[in-house]
Amino acid sequence: MRYVVNPQLVLYVEKGQKIKRALYLTPYGTLDDKSPIYYFLSTHLKITDPEVHKRHILLTLKISQLKGYLCDLLRIRNDVIIYSHKNNLEYSYVDNTIFNPFAHTQKKTLIKSDGFLYNIYPDACDFLVIWVADAEDTSIAEFGSYEDVDVNILKFETRLLEVFDDLDLDMTIESKFNNIFRTNLKFTGLRKLIKKINEFNGSRYKSLLYKSDEYFINLTGNKFILTDERLNLTVWDSDGVVTFSSDGDTIMINNVKLFTSLLTDIDLQMERIKGDVTYKIFLSTPITSRIKLNIETSFIFVETATNNILLSADKRISIILAKNHISIKVKNYIPNIEKYFTFLVIAINSMFNNIQQASDFTKVETVYWSRICQNTKNKHRKPVIVSSLDEDMEKVSDNFYKSSTKEVFINSSGIMFSCLDPLNKYNYVGFLSIFYRLQKMCIPCCFLKNQSHTETFSSCVYQKEIASDVINPYILNFGKVVTKSKISFLPIIFDSFFNEGVKIIFEQDNKRLKETIGYHVIKSCDEDIKRLRTISDIIAFVNEDKNILIAEDIIYFPMNYVDIGTRVYILIQEIVHEIVVVKKHMSKDAIEVFPPNYKLVKNLFPRQTKFITIRSDSGMELTTDGFLVDGKEFNVDLSSNYVAFTKNITTPYTLSKYFSPLFKYAITESKNRFMKTWLINTMLRLGIDLDLDTNILPKLEKYYPNHGKSV
């Protein structure tokens, strides 16, 4: 999702609140006639041609700083009053009604504020409209004032607008609300809530009211699972995210809008225990996590002793920076504030911390090449700077010349590089592909062999773009995230397992693939990037995708053997990759990709049952693989406005021992709950009552033989 910085509106009015100037501010520099601001301007104020300024009011300013900025923007030096039709800004009444200097009621006591704009004006990120009036034109001229602008704010705004067009504002956001209250809901209140959920939002939300005691488990809703609590109401949205959860005494609320909509006729007492929001924002383009600010920015951030942690100016928002994501913790919910602060971080990173450009590599006294291009005793890989071209050199392109003994590359600054190895080995000029792929920087390096056949050489010398779908023959070591054009080795243990007896030939002195008739490697998935951060994420992904996934040294299978597909995934730094077979002929550059030999790992599945029908009646079958209706699996979500109940059980030693060989293969966040669920389902399927039936093992051996081992 690409974040769009919304336009802002400044209205300068005269007597009678007549608008004499309408300033439309936007960092894009053009008017967006589809924006809510323009709709308000054209429809409600009947202004269709406002002044368009490439400017931006920082939402982190205090009201006094904002007033100084507005005075400078409007080029006025007299006392003014600033206000808004949506929120109180500079002044407010005791009863918090909206202040308007042209409709002032003396009976109400005015309170002056110098708070931060985004706190005082909660919709500021989406819809900021500020009215400015000359104090002498109002009935309360004594309340007006003038502020000088902070020049540092103008300097920052100028720098921000300079880099704005180049900012990558694509981001993916995950949020976690920590709104926890004490309540008086109890069981009766929870029953009312789930009844409303089932009546009005049953198709959109999943819900479960769960109550248990020593003997029975009672369930109501449309998502039937076991929990570890005696009493619990949980509601999930369509993405499987918990919207709110309560045990009757406390409640955790993630979706405030949904929860409040259910309270129309419920007398609820709530006492806040904790309230904040944590956002995790994943960036499309990496940033420098350790920000160093070159100008005064205290009106935006407060720097801390840890240089990857920032605080907002009011110290109520904390920001933790990492290379590929930002974590933002907000004390109170403010619409889209996390996107706005992410925008500011990306902008500041671009202003002050951008990776140095190629010109920095041309100064002899500060030359730095990566570790793979340094001189050693027997290798001279770092190119030298030469002052001129030899007479016998031929022009290959505008920036590359060669003779029978030497090659010269000329960078964008006119600096000439050549490879003059005293041992006469590393004489060919090439380029470091990692710098070009990441930053489009052509950093020369010296090689043993001619590099003119490489993609990076073609890009730097002939300005040809690298085809992103062509696989690079260099095989990365396992552990790095694999991009579209790369492949990497499997972890050692799985490399040995998948590639036992398979021959692979590499180029001399490196890991460039030369030839193989079929070798298992890792490549990126062709689909969108998929992140799995928790065990729950992994389990859900495997069961939904119905394919095998490897994470660290564990192989995750779908629950049913018959569901296992033909793809094999592997997790690297929380990102899903896939295992494939590559083939390459020595005489060809192309690398062919084929599906993996999935049967190698599928045969490791610990529980392979025979399909056995337990009961059958009127086209319905209860089997060891599930419940079938007319031969098809019954997978319709069940829903109940009534209470369904089953016997509660403890885990008898006999059953636990019988299934223990199977349970050791189950990967779950709550092993005891999984075992309990398994046993309840098994007893229900087989029609066994633990209190009455003492001859259990023979029945288990019939349908689940050999103590849960493979059959």
Curated annotation (Swiss-Prot):
Predominant location category: virion
InterPro entries: Poxvirus_early-TF_lsu
Pfam families in UniProt: Pox_VERT_large
Swiss-Prot/TrEMBL GO biological process terms: positive regulation of DNA-templated transcription
Organism: Myxoma virus (strain Lausanne)
Gene name of the record: VETFL
Keywords: Activator, DNA-binding, Transcription, Transcription regulation, Virion
Name recorded for this polypeptide: Early transcription factor 82 kDa subunit
UniProt-annotated location(s): Virion
